[in-house]
Amino acid sequence: MTEPVEIFKSLGDETRLRLVNLFLQADEELCVCEMADALDLPQYQISKHLTILKSAGLLLAKRKGTWVYYSVDREESPLLRDLLKVLSRHLSQQQFAADAAKLAQRLALREDGKCVVGFILSAQTNKLRRQKSERKA
């Protein structure tokens, strides 16, 4: 079982709270590149913060081909489940809402539920989304 102190320490950083918010909003596995694009942060920073959250028992990681997908470990402990419920109600500030909107745009680029794009800039995200919509039409 994960120690409560480790869980709370891991959440004592704005970037890690923003990452947890992405998981709560998406309610699905996310790859590092999707999170990096949504938060406009470099991949190495996202990876560093994901490692801390994973070490605290908040996240699970699963390799699928080229990408590693992360998800919230909702089964770890009753404390963690309760904490995630509280966070989902209170992480709605403007920054968190903007992050969730960017993530939704980025997830729209998935094919068959998988990340196929890698790291891109925000302007490229919009361009790729339009191209994908045009191909479907």
Whereabouts are the PLM-identified features?
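N-terminal helix-turn-helix DNA-binding core of bacterial DNA-binding proteins
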Residues: 2-44, 67-75
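A structural preference for long, well-packed, hydrophobic secondary-structure segments
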Residues: 14, 25, 52-55, 72, ...
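Intrinsically disordered, low-complexity linker/tail regions enriched in Pro/Ser/Thr
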Residues: 49-50, 60
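Alpha-helical residues within the helix-turn-helix
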Residues: 37, 48, 54-55
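A general structural signal for well-ordered secondary-structure junctions
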Residues: 14-17, 29, 59, 109-113
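Amphipathic alpha-helical dimerization/coiled-coil segments
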Residues: 2, 78-137
